[in-house]
């Protein structure tokens, strides 16, 4: 009780002073319906459900995957998003020596959602600043609605258990003091549905089959064979005969040894009936049945049946797991943290977001093809690709530029016009040979005319 008393030592939130008791609209705590008895006769509580390997594997997969995702804070203004410093209460929710870190807080938050449908976190304030978060036991928080100025508001009734096992009221608190992250809610409700409660028949059947199998095989609950002898035997005679048979036919050294039966004894092997063997198929069927409850791919909890229905490649299966299994829970947690961020800063442009890049990474060949296309089309810079592959940037800013094909130029710059083609070379005309000048004076005889002949005569 010391932890709760220190956490809620003030008894109630001052914001609730002056509100009349009749204004409370209590919500029936039986919505949690934890510890109900299934038709199989098994009592199903979160602790009992975790004894089923499929339940444990499903909640472990979701809680540990979400808890290890990077969580960043951003500021979005003017259509652009810029990463800013993450508040300490998100990076170090409980920084005291021996306190829990972010992974522990997130893991417990997701476990509360998966097992009980609701997560409650105590918010520790120091003046106007949040200084830490603590995950609360959902079974010790009752949610109510109160009418304030005609509006319905959530308030939380916190309980603890004293040394005598009695329930002790610690006080009433507002959403400023207790962050409530609900799971899937029915229309008109304001608390989440418990998956364990609504699936108690499936989980109860798995528990019953598991218990039946344990009892079936415990200490040879059904004998593998029977030796019949005529007449009657005393208890001492039966014990001697049983011990003699065990000594002669049990153990590795006596394997496949021929057994000799005397005095009319008969050996009969006892086979498992179909009804008795049915629990094996029942247990096998419960694995995908429980995986379906939590929305996880069965192949991720070691049931490879129909694994290709979630995608044919690693990248496709990871994307499907991210979209259909993780994203709904991540959105709820992000919304809760965003409410706290606004309560602390009054800045509605700030928000937190999980980074899913790591889980959506494909095989090396697929990643290299993606980076190659991104680099060629100016989507990524070389340094961004290197950072995604956990490599250091290129020196001297060589990897900061975005590049596109040469016919487009660099991103952010006007492409240089292509140079005009050079005019074709003009060949000089071929030189004609010079004509010989005609000699002056008397022409040749061959070229003489008749008139010239007459003159000569």
UniProtKB/Swiss-Prot annotation:
It is found in: Virion. InterPro entries: Phage/GTA_portal, Portal_HK97. Residues 391-457 are annotated as: Disordered. Residues 429-438, 446-457 have a biased composition (Acidic residues). GO terms for molecular function: DNA binding; peptidase activity. Residues 418-427 have a biased composition (Pro residues). One of its GO terms (cellular component) is viral capsid. Keywords: Capsid protein, DNA-binding, Hydrolase, Protease, Viral capsid assembly, Viral genome ejection through host cell envelope, Viral genome packaging, Viral long flexible tail ejection system, Viral penetration into host cytoplasm, Viral release from host cell, Virion, Virus entry into host cell. Homododecamer. Belongs to the phage portal family. This is Probable portal protein. It comes from Streptomyces phage phiC31 (Bacteriophage phi-C31). The lineage of its organism: Viruses, Duplodnaviria, Heunggongvirae, Uroviricota, Caudoviricetes.
């Amino acid at each position: 009780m010391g932890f709760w008393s220190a956490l809620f030592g003030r008894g109630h939130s001052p914001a609730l002073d002056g509100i009349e008791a009749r204004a409370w609209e209590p919500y029936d705590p039986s919505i949690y319906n934890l510890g109900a008895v299934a038709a199989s006769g098994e009592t199903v509580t979160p602790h009992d459900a975790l004894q089923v390997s499929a339940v444990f594997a499903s909640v472990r997969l979701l809680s540990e995957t979400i808890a290890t995702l990077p969580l960043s804070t951003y500021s979005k203004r003017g259509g652009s998003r810029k990463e800013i410093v993450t508040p300490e209460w998100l990076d170090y929710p409980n920084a005291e020596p021996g306190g829990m870190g972010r992974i522990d807080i997130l893991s417990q938050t997701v476990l509360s959602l998966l097992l009980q449908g609701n997560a409650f976190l105590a918010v520790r304030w120091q003046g106007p600043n949040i200084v830490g978060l603590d995950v609360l036991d959902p079974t010790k928080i009752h949610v109510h609605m109160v009418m304030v100025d005609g509006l319905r508001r959530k308030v939380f009734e916190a309980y603890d258990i004293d040394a005598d096992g009695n329930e002790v009221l610690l006080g009433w608190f507002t959403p400023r003091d207790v962050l409530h992250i609900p799971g899937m809610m029915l229309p008109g409700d304001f608390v989440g549905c418990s998956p364990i409660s609504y699936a108690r028949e499936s989980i109860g059947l798995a528990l019953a089959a598991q218990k039946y199998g344990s009892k079936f095989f415990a200490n040879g609950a059904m004998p593998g064979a029977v030796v019949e002898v005529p007449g009657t035997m005393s208890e001492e005679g039966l014990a001697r005969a049983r011990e003699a048979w065990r000594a002669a036919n049990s153990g590795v050294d006596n394997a496949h040894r021929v057994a000799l039966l005397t005095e009319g004894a008969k050996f009969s092997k006892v086979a498992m009936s179909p009804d008795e063997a049915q629990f094996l198929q029942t247990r096998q069927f419960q694995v995908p049945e429980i995986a379906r409850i939590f929305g996880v791919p069965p192949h991720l909890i070691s049931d490879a049946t129909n694994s290709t229905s979630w995608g044919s490649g690693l990248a496709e299966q990871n994307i499907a797991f991210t979209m259909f299994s993780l994203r709904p829970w991540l959105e709820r947690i992000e919304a809760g943290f965003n409410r706290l961020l606004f309560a602390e800063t009054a800045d509605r442009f700030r928000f937190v977001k999980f980074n899913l890049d790591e889980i959506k990474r494909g095989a090396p060949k697929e990643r290299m093809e993606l980076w190659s296309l991104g680099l060629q089309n100016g989507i990524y810079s070389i340094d961004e690709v290197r950072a995604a592959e956990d490599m250091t940037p290129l020196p001297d800013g060589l990897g900061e530029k975005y590049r596109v094909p040469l016919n487009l130029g660099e991103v952010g710059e006007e492409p240089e016009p292509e140079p005009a083609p050079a005019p074709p070379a003009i060949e000089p005309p071929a030189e004609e040979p010079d004509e010989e000048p005609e000699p002056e004076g008397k022409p040749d005889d061959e070229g003489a005319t008749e008139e010239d002949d007459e003159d000569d005569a």
